[in-house]
From Swiss-Prot:
The modification N6-(pyridoxal phosphate)lysine is found at K225. Its cofactor is pyridoxal 5'-phosphate. It is found in: Cytoplasm. Transmembrane segments: none annotated. Homodimer. The gene is glyA. Keywords: Amino-acid biosynthesis, Cytoplasm, One-carbon metabolism, Pyridoxal phosphate, Transferase. This is Serine hydroxymethyltransferase. Catalyzes the reversible interconversion of serine and glycine with tetrahydrofolate (THF) serving as the one-carbon carrier. This reaction serves as the major source of one-carbon groups required for the biosynthesis of purines, thymidylate, methionine, and other important biomolecules. Also exhibits THF-independent aldolase activity toward beta-hydroxyamino acids, producing glycine and aldehydes, via a retro-aldol mechanism.
Amino acid sequence: MTKNFLDPQLAKAVSGEEERQRHNIELVASENFVSKAVRQAQGSVLTNKYSEGYPGKRYYGGNEYIDIAENLAIERAKELFGVSYANVQPHSGSSANFEAYMAFLHPGDKILGMNLDSGGHLTHGASVSFSGKMYEAQSYKVDSETELLDYDAILKQAKEFKPNLIIAGASAYSRTIDFQAFRDIADEVNAYLMVDIAHIAGLIAAGLHPSPVGLADIITTTTHKTLRGPCGGMILADEKYAKRINSAVFPGSQGGPLDHVVAAKAAAFYEDLQPDFKTYSAQIIKNAKTMADAFSKEPDVRVVSGGTDNHMFTLDLTKTGLNGRQVQDLLDSVSITLNREALPNEKRSPFVTSGVRIGTPAMTTKGLKENEMLQIEHLIMRAIHAHDDKNELTKIKRDVFDLMDKFPFDSNPF
């Protein structure tokens, strides 16, 4: 394996992470396990090449094979989402969002995106992000009672604020997003509509969540999460916007693309186009619903909005007496990985929070199904109830290892 060529200190870190991924229950909603093909592409000699520009129009020679790989990624992305244009060069989802803003806005323009506490992303207008520093930003929130998007309230806010760009999409919203409603709001105030599908891209590609294609002016996404590709970004749009988006990516904000990552995107998109990807994506949702339903029956925790329509949900921990950071650390100690998450109208710091976010893409990739989701829910509640009982926590960690030993690291059934 590659680690045999590494120096001892780095080899220890890599092998340690491999063991962690082998034995842990992975519930971080933004993580997944890529295939050997994706890892092979990302670890290939394409990392040696530099290729500023686009296929057929590079600023360096010797890019004939890089062009083939990038064109494969582009064409597969277009087929996957049914779009006429795709840019696969963004280094990350945040990069893609920055480049989308550059393509459609000027510094100081107004943007309207989802509030962080409601499940939005930093790059949707948070004050600590470039999006809140370069642009005049406001945030819309979920309804305080239902914890769902209130499209009438968003329309009212948009009419008052008059944004140049409205952002739909989230990083911790478990319900179906009505992109047609957002299109109608954008049209009402003469704004561009950007949709960030980073979390639900795989579900959209599989036809299991409504698509923003044909409604959004520009679509951004990551290529990992539910797409099960390498960490990276991508922009989708109508061909009429190609020139302005291409210019915003290069030379507007990036130099050369990461050619090995672009090739890994192509490998992942090939897998996503296979019939079993829909089966896999459907199982992600089944698993999330099963676990959310089980948590909903527990007296000490509450599922935000009452459930999920996608791959993730947020747990309100208020009644447990523990905060999000404490539960994240507690579960880390028994080899269950997730992340602390703010609740709607959160009172605590983002470093603490009152909730945790749970996602099922990674465990679904390993082959776990509904029965295992019930076991995981039980393990989490056992840990919360035994948070100060070291002997019980040791038993829980052993049970986690026993469960994951049934699902080897490279046994991806999909």
